[in-house]
Design a protein with these regions (language model features):
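Beta-strand initiation motifs
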Residues: 94-101, 141-144, 180-183, 220-224, ...
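Autoprocessing Asn-cyclization modules and mimics
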Residues: 1-77, 81-82, 87-94
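Conserved Ser/Thr-centered positions that define the repeating blades of beta-propeller domains
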Residues: 136-137, 175-176, 216-217, 260-261, ...
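Surface loop/turn motifs at the tips and blade-to-blade linkers of beta-strand repeat domains
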Residues: 104-108, 147-150, 186-190, 228-232, ...
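Repeated scaffold domains used in trafficking and secretory/extracellular systems
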Residues: 109-119, 152-160, 192-200, 234-244, ...
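An edge-strand/N-cap motif at the start of beta-rich repeat modules
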Residues: 93-140
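Short glycine/acidic-enriched loop and turn motifs that connect beta-strands
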Residues: 134, 172-173, 212-213, 255-256, ...
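Entry beta-strands of beta-propeller and related beta-repeat scaffolds
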Residues: 122-128, 162-166, 203-206, 246-250, ...
Length: 384
């Protein structure tokens, strides 16, 4: 059944007067907005009043009130209006797969601070790095020791189709073509307090505390740099960087973001026109690009008098959109099942987040989250 809506909001929709379905026929069905305001939103009909034609809706993911979006990261429209066209259709349901975790032994004992995965040739390779140590796996179970890893305080690591690069706060940069054998390429990059690294194709970007951004267009062989933001000698500038959808985004600790739509040649202060993502009540904890989305976990800011729950902000920003708009829209997640703050990763349409204490949660859109059973032992800095 389909038709235009009369009105609606974030938890309900008023169907048109011609809708003749009964409460029994309507409740439990899926409703999908295919055109107009709210396009892409979907939900389960939770209640329906046959007289007023008002249906309340709940999310398929966790049965809480509200809509989800097929492309998670887009804001939910409020209000809906007569341009809103909907389908009501039967809803199939399936049991979610069971979740389990297992420990893996690493060949070199010690703390590991950064990690990433990449597809190099025909192999899926995951690499973990610590101070002077590294471990590599192609199956997540069996790890072998890396060689040549420098003694450094690693801040970030990234992979493209044929290379890994890791950066440190001590100015050391390492690279590897296979994740197993590493070499120091600091001499070709320069010396700085490096905080993040990202890549699109053969173009690599390294960001620093000092406001300098380093760029390579030949897969890390040679580098140029530019002072993108002024540095006062003490206040860190860039803390994170991520890349995807043709877009590079870097951020400072307050969640202010800068975007580049031309492979890192130029940068523009973007999110909220100078305010941090989520506003002054949050500070940023990370920035990643996974499953086609940028995600920024945030923490309640000690600089703001209010107390805010730790969240994750999500955007589907891409190079075409950012080329025509100076403001990137970030959508605030629902409340996560633990106090956080979180680090987050994603693969094959699923996001997984972890706290420092090993509490885990998962999501299919980065907005709605459920708790995974049990708490992992240990202390966690990153999830890959």
């Amino acid at each position: 059944l389909s038709g235009p809506a009369i009105t609606g909001d974030k938890t309900s929709i008023k169907l048109n007067a011609q809708y003749t379905g009964t409460t029994a026929q309507t409740v439990g069905q899926r409703i999908y907005i295919w055109e107009g305001t709210g396009r892409g939103q979907y939900a389960i009909v939770d209640t329906f009043n046959e007289v007023t034609k008002v249906a309340t809706v709940k999310k398929e993911f966790d049965n809480t009130p509200g809509w989800q979006h097929l492309l998670g990261g887009f804001p939910i429209a409020d209000p809906l209006d007569p341009s809103t066209k909907y389908f009501i259709e039967p809803r199939g349901s399936f049991s979610e797969p069971t979740y389990s975790s297992a420990s893996a032994s690493l060949p070199i004992a010690g703390d590991y601070y950064v990690g990433t995965h990449g597809r190099i040739g025909s192999s899926n390779i995951t690499v973990l790095l610590g101070n002077g140590r590294g471990s590599r796996t192609t199956d997540g179970v069996n790890f072998t020791a890396c060689s040549g890893v420098s003694t450094a305080t690693w801040n970030d690591i990234e992979a493209n189709a044929n290379k890994f690069i890791s950066v440190s706060s001590s100015g050391v940069v390492n690279s590897s073509n296979d994740g197993a054998t590493w070499s120091d390429i600091s001499g070709s990059v320069g010396s700085d307090t490096f905080t993040g690294v990202a890549a699109i194709g053969q173009t690599w970007i390294i960001v620093s505390d000092t406001g300098v951004i380093y760029r390579s267009t030949d897969n890390g062989s040679s580098w140029t740099n530019a002072q993108v933001e002024p540095y006062d000698g003490s206040t860190p500038i860039f803390k994170f960087v991520a890349a995807g959808n043709g877009l590079f985004i870097t951020a400072n600790q307050y969640g202010q973001t800068w975007e580049s739509v031309d492979d890192g040649v130029t940068w523009q202060l973007a999110a909220n026109v100078g305010l941090g993502v989520g506003g002054p009540k949050y500070i940023a904890k990370d920035l990643v690009f996974k499953n086609g989305k940028f995600l920024m976990p945030v923490q309640d800011s000690p600089l703001d008098d209010s107390t805010s729950l730790n969240k994750i902000f999500v955007t589907n920003a891409n190079v075409a959109q950012s080329s025509t708009s100076a403001v990137t829209v970030w959508t605030e997640s629902d409340t996560l099942p633990h106090s956080g703050p979180y680090k987050v990763t994603g693969m094959q349409g699923t996001f997984v987040a972890i706290t420092a204490n090993g509490e885990t949660a998962y999501s299919y859109d980065g907005i709605s989250w459920k708790q995974l059973t049990g708490t992992l032992s240990g202390t966690y800095d990153k999830i890959v």
